[in-house]
Amino acid sequence: MGNCCVTPEGSGRGRKKQQQEQKQKQKEPKQQQQQQKKGKKPNPFSIEYNRSSAPSGHRLVVLREPTGRDIAARYELGGELGRGEFGVTYLCTERETGDAYACKSISKKKLRTAVDIEDVRREVDIMRHLPKHPNIVTLRDTYEDDNAVHLVMELCEGGELFDRIVARGHYTERAAALVTRTIVEVVQMCHKHGVMHRDLKPENFLFANKKETAALKAIDFGLSVFFTPGERFTEIVGSPYYMAPEVLKRNYGPEVDVWSAGVILYILLCGVPPFWAETEQGVAQAIIRSVIDFKRDPWPRVSDNAKDLVKGMLNPDPRRRLNAQQVLDHPWLQNIKKAPNVNLGETVKARLQQFSVMNKFKKHALRVIAEHLSVEEVAGIKDMFEKMDLNKDNMINFDELKLGLHKLGHQMADADVQILMDAADVDGNGSLDYGEFVALSVHLRKIGNDEHLHKAFAYFDRNQSGYIEIDELRESLADDLGANHEEVINAIIRDVDTDKDGKISYDEFAAMMKAGTDWRKASRQYSRERFTSLSLKLQKDGSLQLTTTQ
């Protein structure tokens, strides 16, 4: 990868960025280049490389220096291991040696915008840039053909973090300390090499194999980014439960990774997230308040040292928050062998399993939703833009947007229309050009109706009765359930079935999907816009005080 493998320095990174911007500019349509000449900042979400209007012979190139084009020449792809927003992970076998690997195949049809493409490109750059580490999955080879990008990686067969904990008969504070140390060592190594992870959560860690001594490995760097000392970031990314307050304030640095690791530690010790609410806005407000509950079971039995570390990692002021080295130097992690080896109780294990399986229930639904987020969704947007643009100046102002939304059936207060306008109006000129409108339209199609959520519900409602019954839930989650599966199924039904009729209605399913998390993360673009919009809303109602962090 040439310069991509060098530790980012200020001047070197600047040259690299200039080269990328120059290449990017050559790809942009004339209209966007003209906008830049006028000092207008284009919306990166709207630069669509997969549109049918692309020049004849245009071939989307994602990776800078792939290993090759034909993955089948060296590897044989096997069964599916998992599915995400952009692609599918397969078991793959090296033909020459018979060694097994994981292959993440990313469909180019799913990479609609410049941001999507840059995310994949940067993920590869970062995995190649980071030195070999026992707790980070190794990227072996990369391939790119006309249809997809293929990332061949080390295979992790030991399962997810919470599943391993639940499977063990005895779960203690000492076990939580060992996991925390591993996660923070990964954070420390990333920061040392100029990488901020930005999406630390239990699902992004897998065990290498099923042995008791298996290494825990970080597997996903899709939202990670290079940084230089003192550099601040404004883009809202990550997963709601694990998001630091300064991310919502859109002014953050690598300290956010320690916060996320602190959230994981809190969950490891008591089985529930520290900041939770019924809505994503409620979660955001809980994060901003940063009040930590140490009263619920089992906290009275947890050592003072463990609580002290949680407080240090979840300090809402990033300047006073512990850094990765300070976390590793903390007495609780320095004296792991002295950490209490007393069972934290079945309550914590049950909560962890419920939290894990509920996430998997949502993930199954997200998978169905993601499969329906096709390129065809943006069809007709140009026609909609022209109809809304009443004065034909190729821009949509506030009044045109409000009237157009009304005609489309979106009954919105002026304040909410303004929030949408602020979120989509990247250049801040008070009007939306076509590029900004493309991003907003994809956003509106998610909040205007729940067609994708209906499709996900229909997937679980296999007998089309209008309800998800206990047998259907059991069958859908069969691969994710352990020995005490009936207990978990009953816990899910108990939580989701609010009218207590023994089955899950569509309204109950929709409420679960929207509670405390952003189900629309099936579209990463949408999620970014959604949380930017939420941040603006909280700022306006006084919940969010934007402060400058040195």
UniProtKB/Swiss-Prot annotation:
Membrane topology: Lipid-anchor
Keyword check for Isomerase: no
Domain Protein kinase: 75-333
Regulation of activity: Activated by calcium. Autophosphorylation may play an important role in the regulation of the kinase activity.
Residues bound to Ca(2+) 2: 425, 427, 429, 431, 436
Pfam families in alphabetical order: EF-hand_7, Pkinase
Superkingdom in the source lineage: Eukaryota
Tissues/organs with expression: Expressed in roots and leaf blades.
Substrates-to-products reaction catalysed: L-seryl-[protein] + ATP = O-phospho-L-seryl-[protein] + ADP + H(+); L-threonyl-[protein] + ATP = O-phospho-L-threonyl-[protein] + ADP + H(+)
Keyword Nucleotide-binding: yes
Induction: By N-acetylchitooligosaccharide elicitor. Induced by UV-C.
Binding site for Ca(2+) 4: 497, 499, 501, 503, 508
Gene3D superfamilies per UniProt: EF-hand, Phosphorylase Kinase, domain 1, Transferase(Phosphotransferase) domain 1
Residues engaged in binding ATP: 81-89, 104
EC number: 2.7.11.1
GO cellular component: cytoplasm; nucleus; plasma membrane
Domain EF-hand residue range list: 376-411, 412-447, 448-483, 484-519
Residue ranges of the region described as Autoinhibitory domain: 339-369
GO terms, molecular function: ATP binding; calcium ion binding; calcium-dependent protein serine/threonine kinase activity; calcium/calmodulin-dependent protein kinase activity; calmodulin binding; protein serine kinase activity
Basic and acidic residues bias: start-end ranges: 18-30
Localization annotation: Membrane
Protein function: May play a role in signal transduction pathways that involve calcium as a second messenger.
Record note on domains: There are 3 contiguous domains conserved in the CDPK subfamily: a kinase domain, an autoinhibitory (junction) domain and a calmodulin-like domain. The autoinhibitory domain (339-369) inactivates kinase activity under calcium-free conditions.
Record family assignment: Belongs to the protein kinase superfamily. Ser/Thr protein kinase family. CDPK subfamily.
Protein name: Calcium-dependent protein kinase 20
Higher taxonomy: Eukaryota, Viridiplantae, Streptophyta, Embryophyta, Tracheophyta
Gene name per UniProt: CPK20
